[in-house]
Amino acid sequence: MSTNKIPSLELSMYEAFIEDIIGKTFKILPIWEDCAAEKEDFESFNSYLDKLITMLIGSNYIQKEEKIYSVLVMLKGLQQREDLTQRKVKSIVFHCIDLLKKVN
């Protein structure tokens, strides 16, 4: 883990934040599946990704971490793709989770 944290940010708070982000990242898959099953326009999926991406941008401002930047890039790419399948979404979600676990 990088050492350029804001001094007031305690390690345990940061670890809890990363665990929360892991849970939120996992939630991407069922949200996408619900949209695909209902043949929606994926507005709720994109809205959820927007919020998660915003949180990660903020966290990367506080704690410069290469793995968080990688997750940001992957989630933004996920948001931009139109050829998604359940298999692709699952693969990207679990790759992001693996990266986040390495932060903690």
Which residues are covered by each model-predicted region?
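Short terminal alpha-helical segments
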Residues: 1-40, 93-102
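Generic serine detector
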Residues: 2, 8, 12, 44-47, ...
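Short, solvent-exposed segments of well-ordered alpha helices
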Residues: 5-16, 36, 58-62, 66, ...
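Residue-level detector of well-ordered alpha-helical segments, enriched
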Residues: 17, 41-44, 67, 88-92
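Amphipathic alpha-helical interaction modules
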Residues: 23-70
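Amphipathic alpha-helical binding modules
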Residues: 69-104
